[in-house]
C-alpha cells in the first residue's frame, strides 16, 4: 500500500491547532504504512462499531429494516479517473436507504458538488429537504483559474421521510438539533402582518394549526445556524476527499442523538466513524477499497 506522498521540504503547515513539518508528516505516514500492511481485512464487530470490507450494495443487505438513525456519506462524485471514484447506482442505493433508515425521524446527508449534486437531488426529490453549503478556508482547481472561478464550497444534501416544518409535527419531523444556540428570554407577539402566510414556527400555531394572532410567546434562543457552515480543511489527510473531523462531528450532533446508529457506506478513511466515537454514537462503516478499509479500521479502533 502506498499512501499519499509528502514533499521533503521543511515548510510548516497548520494541522488542527498545532504545526508539523512536512518531514514529520512523511515519517508518521511511513510508520503508519508499515502498521497497515500487517492489519487484517477481517470485518470488525463490537457493541458500538461494525466495519465491513466489501461492496456497499451487498453489505447493506445485512442491515435490518428501520435500524439506522443517520446516514452520513461522501459518495464518489465520478469526477476523476481514480478507481474508487465510480458513481454508485443511485436507484439501488435508495432501495437500501429507504429500507434501513428510521422513519420519520431518520436523516440522510450526502456530500456533493455540481453536477453530482443535481443527480442526488433528482434521485429522490420526494425526500429532499434542503442543501447545506460547506465553505472551506482554501480554494481548489487553481489550474483552471483563468477559465472559471475556483471552488471553495461543497454541498451537503439533506434527505428525510420526516418533515422539516412545524406544520408537519402531527406526522413526525426529522431529527434536528441546531448547534451553537445562545440562550435568551425575549417576549414577542404574533401578528399576521409580521408572519405573513408562511408558518414555519410551532409557537405561531394553535389548535388545528391556525395562526394565533397577537398572542405572546417567549423566544428561548438566538444564533440559529444558517445554511452556510464554515470549517477549515485538514492538511494532514490521507484519502483524497477526506473531510474534517470537526465538520463531521457538527453534522452528527445536528442530525442525530447520543446512542443512535450512524451509517457511512463509503467510509473512505473512516472520519465519520471517528466522529461517532467522539460524539458517543454507534457506527456502521462499509468500504470496498482494501487499503482504505485498513486505514479506517486503524483510525477508528485506535480512537476508542
Map each language-model feature to its residues:
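Cysteine-dependent PTP/DSP-like catalytic domain, specifically the C-terminal lobe
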Residues: 293-304
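Core catalytic lobe of class I
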Residues: 2-5, 9, 13-14, 18, ...
Amino acid at each position: 500500500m502506498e499512501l499519499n506522498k509528502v514533499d521533503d521540504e521543511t515548510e510548516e503547515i497548520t494541522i488542527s491547532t498545532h504545526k508539523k513539518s512536512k518531514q514529520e508528516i512523511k515519517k508518521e505516514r511511513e510508520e503508519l504504512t508499515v502498521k497497515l500492511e500487517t492489519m487484517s481485512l477481517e470485518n470488525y464487530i463490537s457493541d458500538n462499531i461494525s466495519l465491513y470490507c466489501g461492496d456497499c450494495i451487498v453489505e447493506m443487505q445485512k442491515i435490518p429494516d428501520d435500524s439506522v438513525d443517520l446516514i452520513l456519506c461522501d459518495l464518489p462524485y465520478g469526477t476523476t479517473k481514480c478507481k474508487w471514484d465510480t458513481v454508485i447506482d443511485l436507484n439501488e442505493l435508495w432501495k437500501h436507504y429507504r429500507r434501513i433508515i428510521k422513519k420519520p425521524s431518520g436523516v440522510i446527508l450526502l456530500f456533493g458538488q455540481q453536477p453530482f449534486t443535481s443527480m442526488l437531488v433528482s434521485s429522490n426529490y420526494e425526500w429532499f429537504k434542503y442543501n447545506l453549503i460547506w465553505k472551506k478556508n482554501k480554494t481548489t482547481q487553481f489550474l483552471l483559474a483563468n477559465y472559471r472561478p475556483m471552488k471553495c464550497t461543497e454541498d451537503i444534501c439533506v434527505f428525510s421521510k420526516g418533515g422539516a416544518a412545524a406544520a408537519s409535527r402531527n406526522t413526525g419531523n426529522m431529527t434536528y438539533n441546531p448547534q451553537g444556540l445562545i440562550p435568551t428570554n425575549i417576549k414577542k407577539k404574533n401578528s399576521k402582518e409580521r408572519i405573513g402566510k408562511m408558518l414555519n414556527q410551532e409557537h405561531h400555531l394553535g389548535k388545528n394549526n391556525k395562526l394565533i394572532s397577537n398572542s405572546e410567546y417567549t423566544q428561548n434562543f438566538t444564533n440559529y445556524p444558517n445554511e452556510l457552515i464554515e470549517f477549515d480543511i485538514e492538511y494532514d489527510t490521507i484519502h483524497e476527499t477526506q473531510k474534517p473531523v470537526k465538520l463531521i462531528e457538527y453534522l452528527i450532533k445536528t442530525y442525530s442523538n447520543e446512542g443512535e446508529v450512524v451509517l457511512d457506506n463509503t467510509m473512505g478513511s473512516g472520519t465519520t466513524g471517528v466522529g461517532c466515537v467522539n460524539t458517543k454514537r454507534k457506527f456502521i462503516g462499509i468500504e470496498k477499497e482494501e487499503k482504505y478499509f485498513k486505514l479506517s479500521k486503524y483510525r477508528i479502533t485506535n480512537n476508542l
